[in-house]
């Protein structure tokens, strides 16, 4: 499956039928407690990541939350 992540095309080895957002994020090494995810211009609540299916060509924007002071 090909998806665009932060403007870069990525190929992820996921079965199209079972390609969930949570699985893709885990596969790419993202930690769920430290990111905000936008899928095709919509912010996706982390409580829904398990239910959201990805499709070939989807656009993800992933923003990491960093603390500081």
Regions found by a protein language model. Give the residues of each.
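Ubiquitin-like/PB1-type beta-grasp interaction modules and other compact soluble beta-rich domains
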Residues: 1-68
């Amino acid at each position: 499956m090909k998806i665009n992540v932060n403007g870069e095309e990525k190929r992820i080895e996921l079965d199209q039928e079972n390609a969930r957002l949570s699985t893709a994020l885990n596969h790419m090494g993202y930690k769920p407690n430290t990111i905000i995810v936008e899928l095709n211009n919509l912010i996706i609540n982390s409580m829904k990541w398990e239910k959201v299916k990805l499709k070939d060509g989807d656009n993800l924007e992933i923003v990491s939350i960093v603390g500081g002071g």
